[in-house]
């Protein structure tokens, strides 16, 4: 089996991270993989925001927690010290798919580099808020973008989870 197929089969969502920061060189490689994701008509509309500043990461975590309805103090990013936020231009008819493909590439690249990842939702709600719109504006990002997801990144704290058995009857063949 090829290395790529093996990585697809063995990548798992991590929900317990060490506090050690992922090196910038590794983050750059992961981001590059995201930038090479397929996109509708090759438009490459998704953008990626890297967040490693602890204060901002914690602020986003609190907002995400509130949106998710959890008790104050819960960290929906499971302690991950780094995150890559994927947004896509709403004017593209394939923007959700394009952003989702970026997320997949980010997670596979992280796994290849020995870095744990987890897709964290609620980016859509975050960036629909005044906070999110002002944050994008502060970065010089203009236009109508929708948050697709956060790719939480860090080193696995504990055992790497095994893949559960695959469900049956999910493929139908027409020959």
What residues fall within each predicted segment?
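Acidic, surface-exposed loops and disordered segments
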Residues: 1-175
């Amino acid at each position: 089996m090829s290395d790529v197929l093996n990585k697809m089969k063995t990548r798992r969502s991590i929900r317990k991270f060490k506090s050690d920061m992922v090196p910038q060189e590794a983050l750059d490689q992961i981001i590059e993989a995201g930038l090479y994701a397929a996109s509708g008509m090759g438009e490459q509309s998704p953008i990626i925001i890297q967040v490693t500043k602890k204060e901002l990461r914690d602020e986003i975590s609190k907002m995400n927690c509130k949106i998710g309805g959890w008790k104050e103090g819960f960290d929906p990013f499971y302690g991950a010290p780094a995150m890559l936020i994927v947004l896509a231009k709403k004017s593209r008819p394939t923007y959700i798919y394009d952003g989702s493909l970026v997320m997949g590439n980010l997670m596979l690249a992280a796994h290849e580099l020995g870095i744990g990842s987890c897709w964290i939702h609620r980016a859509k709600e975050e960036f629909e808020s005044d906070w999110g719109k002002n944050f994008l504006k502060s970065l010089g990002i203009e236009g109508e973008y929708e948050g697709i997801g956060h790719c939480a990144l860090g080193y696995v704290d504990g055992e790497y989870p095994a893949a559960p058995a695959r469900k049956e009857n999910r493929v139908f063949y027409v020959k």
